[in-house]
């Protein structure tokens, strides 16, 4: 079942030059992502530190969108929803809860959105952050041992027609 378009980029390096070649390809339903009709994903990356246990979709992109950027799901509960006719220019989205972006939204290059503080405000809880991350990386699963229970988080909602 075809659900959208994605641009793949190949970079060729010649001494003194860097040439980016973009190729339009089709995106099939995979990795818990639903993409609406006529949307283009360019320089698009999804990182799931922990996949949803029930395998349900966690990212929804509406129709007629142009989306670039990196989307990081730090735990199994995060969901990102993007409305129709939305542009995201190379941003970073880090989600443990919920990020909702309305329709007809324009987000400029280099914006970062986090629905969490990434680290607890309590020093006693942060003491293990580095060792927990290192342990997960050594096992090939970054974030596996991160304790999100004491990290403050709240949903982000960008309403229709916002411009950032």
Give residue ranges: language-model regions.
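PRPP/pyrophosphate-binding module of the type I phosphoribosyltransferase fold
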Residues: 164
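Domain-scale signature associated with acetyltransferase and cell-envelope carbohydrate enzymes
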Residues: 1-161
């Amino acid at each position: 079942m075809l659900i959208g378009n994605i641009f793949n980029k190949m970079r060729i390096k010649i001494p003194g030059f860097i040439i980016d070649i973009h190729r339009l390809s089709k995106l099939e339903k995979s990795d818990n992502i639903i993409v609406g009709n006529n949307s283009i994903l360019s320089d698009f990356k999804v990182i799931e530190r922990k996949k949803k246990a029930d395998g349900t979709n966690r990212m929804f992109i509406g129709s007629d969108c142009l989306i670039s950027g990196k989307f990081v799901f730090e735990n199994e509960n995060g969901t990102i929803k993007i409305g129709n006719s939305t542009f995201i220019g190379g941003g970073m989205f880090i989600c443990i809860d919920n990020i909702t972006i309305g329709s007809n939204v324009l987000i400029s290059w280099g914006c970062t959105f986090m629905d969490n503080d990434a680290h607890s405000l309590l020093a006693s809880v942060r003491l293990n952050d580095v060792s927990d991350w290192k342990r997960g990386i050594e096992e090939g699963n970054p974030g596996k041992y991160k304790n999100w229970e004491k990290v403050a988080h709240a949903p982000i909602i960008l309403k229709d027609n916002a411009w950032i």
